[in-house]
Amino acid sequence: MFLEKLKLLNSIFEEVESKLSDLSVISNQEEYRELTKQHFYLRPLAEKYIRYSKLLNEIKDAEELQKSKDAEMKEIAFAEYNNLIEKRNQMENEIKVLLIPTDPNEDKNIIVEIRAGTGGNEAALFVGDLYGMYTRFAERNGWKYEVLGSNPTGLGGYKEVVFEINGGKVWRCFKFERGAHRVQRVPETEASGRVHTSAATVAVLPEAEEVDVEIKMEDLRIDTYRASGAGGQHINKTDSAIRITHLPTGLVVACQDERSQIKNRAKAFKVLRAKIYEQRILEHEMRLSSERKQQIGSGDRSEKIRTYNFPQNRITDHRIGYSVYNITEVMDGNLSELVNKLIKADIESKLKENNI
């Protein structure tokens, strides 16, 4: 099965490689870009085809040597055969993963939006905790981040915070964070020691380039106003804050963190483009309802994905039914264990979905 499929993909790879050296193709940017994507996806599979074919031949040779009448030779051949079978099984698992259709957002940077849900001040504090967890996770991985917009409460929390993270594989690691996060803990102001439940929603948007989303100026309403800090007091004497409304979709983005209107405008456009791109992706996924059922989480902000129970020192991811008991470490940015479990579960569901 694998050999025939790899043989076919290898022939397609050779055809794509040939086209990429054709001057008429090189001059056609759209076709060249599409072929480059195919080449990027097929190259590892073509390399596996060569190695896998060679490995199967080595297994055949080891099988023949096991028929030897020489007892010592037979023993060596048997050990070699078992070793090669183990290598084959490992390589087949690697091939399965490579056969999964590539995520078009795999190499994109991201914009993360965290909003306070039910729970008042506790929910706002939880937004701050999640922001700290994600930015420390970014630091651990050498990724850069920058705040694009925030609405602080003045109590160390946020009604909302929006920030971008740039670096390799950020989308792969963060895309499973989309949804509703619930926290259970005793607030510092709670004299009776009663556990309160609060929530925050997280949206993770792949950063869209101009080639991904075209925004027409006639589709926008742009308002300017004075930036305000916690409590509503004005912190700038000029109308530096920006609010952009995308009329066709009704999406609204506001940015006031920078003192410069130009910088706020640039940040707002970046977030708006990502939101429009996300909306298109979700509409496409909705049309593929059977696919959504197979995936680890729908990406819907209202879907409850995780509970952070501080009294029990436990974090539970409800999509995969997995719990960790090191809440302090996780909140300090040590998300790798949870992320790796989610990636593994996602791969398994996609293998099943694609009959691989």
From Swiss-Prot:
PROSITE patterns: RF_PROK_I
A Pfam entry, by short name: PCRF
UniProt key word Cytoplasm: yes
Family in the record: Belongs to the prokaryotic/mitochondrial release factor family.
Localization (cell): Cytoplasm
Protein name according to UniProt: Peptide chain release factor 1
Family matches, as SUPFAM superfamilies: Release factor
